[in-house]
Amino acid sequence: MKSPTPSRPQKMALIPACIFLCFAALSVQAEETSVTPQPPDILLGPLFNDVQNAKLFPDQKTFADAVPNSDPLMILADYRMQQNQSGFDLRHFVNVNFTLPKEGEKYVPPEGQSLREHIDGLWPVLTRSTENTEKWDSLLPLPEPYVVPGGRFREVYYWDSYFTMLGLAESGHWDKVADMVANFAHEIDTYGHIPNGNRSYYLSRSQPPFFALMVELLAQHEGDAALKQYLPQMQKEYAYWMDGVENLQAGQQEKRVVKLQDGTLLNRYWDDRDTPRPESWVEDIATAKSNPNRPATEIYRDLRSAAASGWDFSSRWMDNPQQLNTLRTTSIVPVDLNSLMFKMEKILARASKAAGDNAMANQYETLANARQKGIEKYLWNDQQGWYADYDLKSHKVRNQLTAAALFPLYVNAAAKDRASKMATATKTHLLQPGGLNTTSVKSGQQWDAPNGWAPLQWVATEGLQNYGQKEVAMDISWHFLTNVQHTYDREKKLVEKYDVSATGTGGGGGEYPLQDGFGWTNGVTLKMLDLICPKEQPCDNVPATRPLSESTTQPLKQKEAEPTP
């Protein structure tokens, strides 16, 4: 879907023409011949809609994950014959014709475990294996075992997995890291990209592209051999994100690619479908109905694209933070996504060089340099003094500060003077007693205040350290770890997100109850434990007092959340 072509730009960015040919060639490579599995809303048609609208299950994901016991076409035919008969019981029909997902056994950790021991004991509990799946299962098979987040998330998730893998590496489970990289490479080879998760209903979108960083992580253990082995899959994933770029005119967008008026190429989040999400069917229909001034398909696409961002949902995507139906994800150019694309280009350059292809390495370096200039030009708010998203409708950088602003520092794409300003903005506006706030807006959405998420804590910590801003980086780690430890001491679990306005409380908001487990929290906690404790005195719990070897700061008072961006 291309936007209307505006007036021609005065000056186009100069990028070698051979690179566009490279995109086209890689796009052809990424096209797969395998039949794409159909999601349950397509397989089951009106039956799926009726079951979800009947709200037979508290969680809409339950029926999306149910496995038909026979050919869905036969089940649908039976349903059409029986549904209008007197005494028809929809719940009984579902129970007869589907195998519902089993609730995972409640994990009861042994008494007296330290935080580190608890996490190390969870890795086998969270490991799954699905080499083979039922014919009509929404679960997609993967060749190697993998670690799931936990709770209702019974499948592997793309960007979650990177932070989980950091913890696996910290625990010495390099075999599991290698298995998960192999699985994601398999998905790229099979579907042309890494889906949101290994479910058929996730195939229409991806998530924040961390695959190249996963390969880079594996290369810490296996050397350049890992970079060379997975170079073809990294190239295919890059082609997926840049699909359609060779035909774009200035001022147009195509799927995940945006070409601005001066020819700058950036990316956005996008889902190929514009229908309600099967796993949140009723909620999406209600959101679309609540705003009759917008086409429902437009709202569905933006809801799905927000899910692709990993930030589902946040005031970041919304015109009115209190109204989800005002989100417009596809008209926003995200600072975190483009930072990850920059990092992907840099790793592709490194891998190409390792493979002996210096010409291709130079092309990826050219792309990375062009994107870095685009980030500095379009994704920096000079008036506010922080990185932010770019608005395709207003043609301006947005004003809202979010934790995504730390991504340019995380991938070493930021100018040094801007990194210093980001440290100040982070400490002033986002740092709380229990860690880093996602935004400073209280919207009731889970990717807003007062919630803090493990991956964003790690991105901020690493990013600030990259630019010598160690004091703020250590503040973030210490405050978040204290929160994790206090919650663990009380509840004996690690959770998906935390309330950072204080310590010892799990986060709230969103479409489902708080989940425990939890893959990425486990991974980030292990990394941070090793960061704050001296190497000669590693710690298994968060120390009662902050280690003296690091800078100390005064306790933070809770900052007031802002009502609007």
UniProtKB/Swiss-Prot annotation:
This enzyme's EC code(s): 3.2.1.28
Residue ranges, annotated region (Disordered): 539-565
Taxonomic superkingdom: Bacteria
Predominant localisation class: periplasm
Binding site for substrate: R152, W159, D160, N196, R205, S206, Q207, R277, P278, E279, G310, E511
Cellular location(s): Periplasm
Database matches in InterPro entries: 6-hairpin_glycosidase_sf (IPR008928), 6hp_glycosidase-like_sf (IPR012341), Glyco_hydro_37 (IPR001661), Glyco_hydro_37_CS (IPR018232), Trehalase_periplasmic (IPR023720)
Disulfide-linked positions: none
Family, as annotated: Belongs to the glycosyl hydrolase 37 family.
Protein name in UniProt: Periplasmic trehalase
Organism: Escherichia coli O7:K1 (strain IAI39 / ExPEC)
